[in-house]
Amino acid sequence: DITISMKSTDFLKMPECVINEVPVYLSPDEQDIYDTFREDMVIKLKTDEIDAVNAAVLSGKLLQMANGAVYDEDSKTHQIHDRKLDALEDLIEGANGKPVLIAYWYNHDLERICKRFDVRQIKTSKDIADWNSGNIQVAVIHPASAGHGLNLQSGGSTLIWFGLTWSLELYQQTNARLWRQGQRDTVV
């Protein structure tokens, strides 16, 4: 038996996909909180303590901290910084009015994004139709629920990852919501 595997880019004319990494730097105090937590697996924030019981929990909480907030054991959110939100604001402004799709991972990321920006979640078929018609300026999606099967390429060509996932599959599939057959513009 012979198996042939082909990528869509092998036989479809696709626009360019540009991956643009935007570094976000913490202040010295914020970096100290991050580093202390990474080393000690416990940190005191104001009146509450955040701890990680093992390396897997530590990894997830460090990812949360890098995004700007972290959950404690009671699922209460503790804000660390707004640096990613500031960078997100710059990127949205830099899109010069073009529609922007934002991928988030943690619920506290979504809450903070919704509090700061006028965004709409892509959750229903009406949301998808409105996005593809160009009626949504800034939309948010969660890779686990929007990573497969959605056709969002008609609504825009800019995807911003506010927080990354550990899943390469979800990352690639979410990117493929915009960079797919039918997209006319360079995907950023």
Q: Would you name each region that the model predicts?
A:
Residues 81-89, 107, 125-128, 172:
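Short, well-ordered alpha-helical scaffold segments within catalytic/effector domains
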